[in-house]
Amino acid sequence: MSIVSDLSRWLAGGPVAFAERRVRCASPSGLHRVAYTEWGEPENPNVLVCVHGLTRNGRDFDELARTLAADYRVICPDVVGRGRSDWLRDPSGYTFPQYASDMMVLLARLNVASVHWLGTSMGGLIGMWIASQEDSPITRLVLNDVGPLISVASLLRIGEYVGQAPKFDTYEDAEKYVRLVSQPFGPLSDAQWRHLTEFSLQRLPDGRLAMR
């Protein structure tokens, strides 16, 4: 899988405009790039921003974005340190203020007056913070798998795998891991599990696979 810029692809169900882009952001440790996918017509003022959970990436929304692209310009970023976005030089920089700052840079890049926001878990928390600000560009906020309060049980479960860096000798082993840690996603089809897995992996110099 390789990065493709400004690409229109023929996808299932007809032609859907699709592009992979990046926007440059700043942190106390320097500059970094945030990657995002854009679905639908770039001139469509009806914009939906979809932001993923703590250990996931923007490609989780591919199926939804493809479905909504006829009516929305759908933007799906990889939060810094995930997916195809850069990593921060300082590991202590992965904080919600940094994530929110990056997303505000992205929203400015879109050059639109308002957006709808769909946030899963961490993406919902980022959305709540931005939506709470005066003159926020978010006009509608949809929360998935998150709310104003987070249970202790949920935090303990996340703590079981966050920060781990597992390596896999085979794709099958990697998919088993993704299915295990992502069980709360629900009864997905085999094709959906394959999609989540493929866009979660990177090939290491030694030939093994690791999570992005």
Question: Which residues are covered by each model-predicted region?
Answer:
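Alpha/beta-hydrolase fold catalytic core
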Residues: 1-48, 70-72
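Active-site loop/oxyanion-hole signature of alpha/beta-hydrolase fold enzymes
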Residues: 28-30, 37, 63-66, 76-118
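Serine-hydrolase catalytic-loop signature spanning alpha/beta hydrolases and amidase-signature enzymes
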Residues: 53-63, 74
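Alpha/beta-hydrolase active-site loop signature
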Residues: 55, 79-83, 148
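Conserved hydrolase catalytic core segment
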Residues: 113-152
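A catalytic-pocket lid/entrance helix-loop region that shapes and gates access to the active site
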Residues: 138-140, 144-173
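Alpha/beta-hydrolase
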Residues: 176-212
